């Protein structure tokens, strides 16, 4: 490992040699038709009248025509009109804390560490794996991705360039996504958090990646230094755990001190963050001897550790939540990523993470030999705090602890069937699981709600996502029939097939750039801007009481399928509204892993019931489709 080199291959220009098309702008009429379909389903659950909604819709085409014309002009001049509006509304202007509310956790397979040296070694291997992947990105040696559909269209690779080169800087009213500039000296570094202290780990010097041995040596040095200074820390990591405006005010105060400004620049320019959590080892047992229920509990414990660090009293402040990638590695063997989501989607991060995991697993049991003399040393960052900044840190930590305590996480490892059986039933696995979640919500609450499932629009330049809404009229008719003892199996099967076809149609609309959410978001933003600048009336559709209910998501879902050679992985995140559920899922050939979440104190949710309903819905549909 001492002499290991990364191949410095020439850049592969085919990432950008073929210009991708701009996304289309859907027609007002098509978007309005789809919106009314979803509004009708939500209205049933709300027991609300659609009269005012239909009246507002009747006026909408006339009222929104100037907005549509303005949007068409923007689309002509902008690389991607959708991302221009979507990114600020989805992330940058949201004032809630990013932990739980926004930042997902990607849980890696647990590792058994016999010694502290094992912990440092595995962390160094994961770190080095990420650094090597960064090198592949820089030299464009990551193969350009293509869509999974029949056409195999080229996908935008911009997110790969951004994932380790962006930072979310808090601002009053709106955050800023900073693109880090490459330095002329060829030096790069990683931020390391250990015992709530901040350190720089040098990762590239004069253009050359430092050796694995130097990464491990620096981590060991950081652990030793942090132990000596552990009673002299002010918990700087608390800066990003609370409301975004408070985070911005904290840094406004801090940056009046020159030393703080220098340290902050080091932080913002770091490639990613490594969080070394030093705790007593926890014996979760061996995975192969666990029952399913024991394994689910172990998955849950790992999820809490990765998402929140179990709050400020444990490891929740040994984090830097404004960074895109936080690699969390605990001495208990728990490890994974905590992700600031505004920069990139899951598939990009999974591809990077799985490369690092394979690298670490390959070399972890190997005996490392290197020279005793090491010339690369980490750097400890210095901070000076005013009374005001200390008070803000304290308040941020209090908000964070409430969030961490409120997060309720469950894991369902459903191992009765998986992707293989679903394909044998001639159903899209993702569409199948989307309908399963509709049925589970109906079983739990007796109605459907607006549902979020991201659809990649990376076939367009600078494309991110739109929203596949699974709460269609066809889905409502099917789940209603499934709950009825009067409906025949044949009728239920007929309605299921209709719901599947509609799900496929809506999915195709979204990935082709004709979804409704990005379009409505842009129109709403333009209307709000006109009202603020000219006093022009906002279209009545945006003032309709049902609008806010249709545009919030009590069921937020995401497919995160991981590779077969890396088992025991899953992704999780908090619900996006207080009375809702988060429900990411991992579809494997013989099983499906669900990771539903909710907020403990909200009486409108029942996570245990919802988990049971997911399993029940899976069995119900298997029975429906089995001959």
UniProtKB/Swiss-Prot annotation:
Expressed in SIA, SIB and SMB sublateral motor neurons. Its EC number is 2.3.1.6. GO terms for biological process: acetylcholine biosynthetic process; neuromuscular synaptic transmission. It holds the Pfam family Carn_acyltransf. Disruption phenotype: RNAi-mediated knockdown in SIA sublateral motor neurons results in abnormal sleep behavior whereby larvae display a defect in 'flipping,' which is a left-right turning behavior that occurs during sleep. GO terms for cellular component: cytoplasm; cytosol; excitatory synapse; neuron projection; neuronal cell body; organelle membrane; plasma membrane; synapse. CoA binds at residues 418-430, 456, 559. It is an enzyme of class 2 (transferase). Keywords: Acyltransferase, Neurotransmitter biosynthesis, Transferase. It catalyses: choline + acetyl-CoA = acetylcholine + CoA. One of its GO terms (molecular function) is choline O-acetyltransferase activity. InterPro entries: Carn_acyl_trans, CAT-like_dom_sf, Cho/carn_acyl_trans, Cho/carn_acyl_trans_2. Residues 1-20 are annotated as: Disordered. The active site is at residue 341. Belongs to the carnitine/choline acetyltransferase family. Catalyzes the reversible synthesis of acetylcholine (ACh) from acetyl CoA and choline at cholinergic synapses. Required in SIA sublateral cholinergic motor neurons for a left-right turning behavior that occurs during the lethargus phase of the normal sleep process called 'flipping'. During 'flipping' animals rotate 180 degrees about their longitudinal axis. This is Choline O-acetyltransferase. It comes from Caenorhabditis elegans. The gene is cha-1.
């Amino acid at each position: 490992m001492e002499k290991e080199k990364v191949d410095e291959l020439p850049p592969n220009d085919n990432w950008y040699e073929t210009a991708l098309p701009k996304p289309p702008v859907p027609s007002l009429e098509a978007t309005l038709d789809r919106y009314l379909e979803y509004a009708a389903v939500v209205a049933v659950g709300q027991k609300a009248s659609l009269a005012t909604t239909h009246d507002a819709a009747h006026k909408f085409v006339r009222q929104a025509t100037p907005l549509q014309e303005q949007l068409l002009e923007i689309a002509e001049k902008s690389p991607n009109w959708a991302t221009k509006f979507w990114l600020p509304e989805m992330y940058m202007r949201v004032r809630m804390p990013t932990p739980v509310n926004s930042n997902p956790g990607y849980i890696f397979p647990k590792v058994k560490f016999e010694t502290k040296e094992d912990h440092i070694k595995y962390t160094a291997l994961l770190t080095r794996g990420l650094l090597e992947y960064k090198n592949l990105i820089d030299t464009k040696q990551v193969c350009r991705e293509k869509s999974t559909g029949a056409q195999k269209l080229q996908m935008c690779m911009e997110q790969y360039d951004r994932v380790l080169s962006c930072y979310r800087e808090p601002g009053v009213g709106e955050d800023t996504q900073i693109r880090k500039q490459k330095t002329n000296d060829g030096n790069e570094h990683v931020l390391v958090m250990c015992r709530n202290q901040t350190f720089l780990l040098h990762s590239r010097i004069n253009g050359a990646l430092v050796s694995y041995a130097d990464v491990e040596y620096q981590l060991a040095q950081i652990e030793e230094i942090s132990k000596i200074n552990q009673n002299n820390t002010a918990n700087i990591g608390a800066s990003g755990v609370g409301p975004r405006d408070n985070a911005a005010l904290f840094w406004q105060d801090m940056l009046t001190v020159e030393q703080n400004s220098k340290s902050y620049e080091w932080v913002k320019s770091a490639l990613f963050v490594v969080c070394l959590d030093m705790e007593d080892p926890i014996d979760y047992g061996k995975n192969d001897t666990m029952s399913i229920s024991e394994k689910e509990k172990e998955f849950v414990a790992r999820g809490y550790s990765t998402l929140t660090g179990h709050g400020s009293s444990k490891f929740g402040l040994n984090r830097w939540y404004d960074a895109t990638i936080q690699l969390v590695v605990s001495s208990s063997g728990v490890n994974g990523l905590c992700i600031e989501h505004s920069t990139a989607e899951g598939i990009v991060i999974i591809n990077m993470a799985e490369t690092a995991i394979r690298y670490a697993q390959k070399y972890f049991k190997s005996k490392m030999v290197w020279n005793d003399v090491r010339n690369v040393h980490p750097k400890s960052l210095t901070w000076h705090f005013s009374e005001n900044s200390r008070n803000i840190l304290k308040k941020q930590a209090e908000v964070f602890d409430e969030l961490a305590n409120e997060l309720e996480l469950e894991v369902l490892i459903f191992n009765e069937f998986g992707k293989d059986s679903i394909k044998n039933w001639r159903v899209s696995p993702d569409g199948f699981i989307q309908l399963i979640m509709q049925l589970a919500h109906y079983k739990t609450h007796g109605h459907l709600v607006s549902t979020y499932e991201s659809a990649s629009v990376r076939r367009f330049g600078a494309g991110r996502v739109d929203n596949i809404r699974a709460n269609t009229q066809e889905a409502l008719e099917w789940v209603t029939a499934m709950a009825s003892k009067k409906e025949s199996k044949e009728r239920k099967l007929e309605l299921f097939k209709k719901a599947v076809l509609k799900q496929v149609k809506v999915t195709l609309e979204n990935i082709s750039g004709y979804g409704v959410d990005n379009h409505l978001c842009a129109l709403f933003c333009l209307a709000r801007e006109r009202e603020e600048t000219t006093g022009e009336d906002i279209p009545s559709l945006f003032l309709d009481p049902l609008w806010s209910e249709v545009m919030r998501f009590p069921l937020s879902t995401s497919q995160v399928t991981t590779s077969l050679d890396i088992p025991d992985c899953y992704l999780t995140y908090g619900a996006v509204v207080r009375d809702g559920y988060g429900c990411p899922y991992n579809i494997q050939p013989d099983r499906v892993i669900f990771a539903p979440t909710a907020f403990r104190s909200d009486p409108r949710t029942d996570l245990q019931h919802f988990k049971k309903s997911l399993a029940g819905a899976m069995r119900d549909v298997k029975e429906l489709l089995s001959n």
